[in-house]
Amino acid sequence: MAARAFSAVQLVNGSTGDPVLYLDYPGSDNALLFDGGDNHALTMTQLGDLEAVFISHHHVDHFIGLDRIMRANIDRDKTLHLFGPENTIQKVYDRIRSYEYPFFPFQKITVEVTELLAGKKRTALLECTKRFPPPEVREHEWDGRVCYENDSLQVEAVAVDHTVPCLAYAMAERSGFHPDSDKLAGGLLRPGAWVQEALRMLSQ
């Protein structure tokens, strides 16, 4: 067993393009995206699998991919978590509202946007079923570290020095069993949802 929990770890645009890191789990619709630059190298299916997006700052090469993220998820019945520095809520809302929508009944996407600040976080829900009304912002205390976690990992965020408000993120896997995806792909069994179910049972 190797300490690699993901079926896909992709530096989407290489080392010289817009910063985008895509992390995917085998057989689950809960991928993570670190930074929101140009993401045309990802398929709409990959973007539709996203559970959380982590924006470092709002320069164009870190934020321009938001439109495509929304396009891939607008027809889904899910909550997409999006994290970023100060003013992220308003900037995301303005981008979403710059388009017209048919608001079909099956379009049930909710974008939960969280701004991470010193000692506090602000959260707002942008809901398609309510036709994306102006966000109602809720403020909570925050210890300045863990901003997101699930059964497999947790993500920490810290403010860093830049010309604009900016965050750096660190991801840490939880202890447990992590399959070697290369060996799995070369065997008789194929990756799928059963992998996550097996890991869940092993962790109990």
Predicted features by range, described:
Residues M1-Q46, A52, A168-M171, F177:
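Conserved beta-strand hairpin/beta-sheet module of binuclear metal-dependent hydrolase folds
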Residues K120, F132-E141:
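A conserved mid-domain beta-alpha-beta active-site/ligand-binding segment of alpha/beta enzyme cores
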Residues D38-G84, F103:
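Active-site metal-binding motif and surrounding structural segment of the metallo-beta-lactamase
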Residues L66-I69, V92-I96:
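Hydrophobic packing residues within well-ordered alpha-helices of enzyme cores
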Residues F34, H57, L82, V155, ...:
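Divalent metal-coordination and catalytic microenvironments
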Residues E86-I89, L117-G119:
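Short beta-alpha junction loops
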Residues V137-Q204:
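Metal-dependent phosphodiesterase/nuclease catalytic metal-binding core
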Residues E100-G119:
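A glycine-rich helix N-cap at a beta->alpha junction
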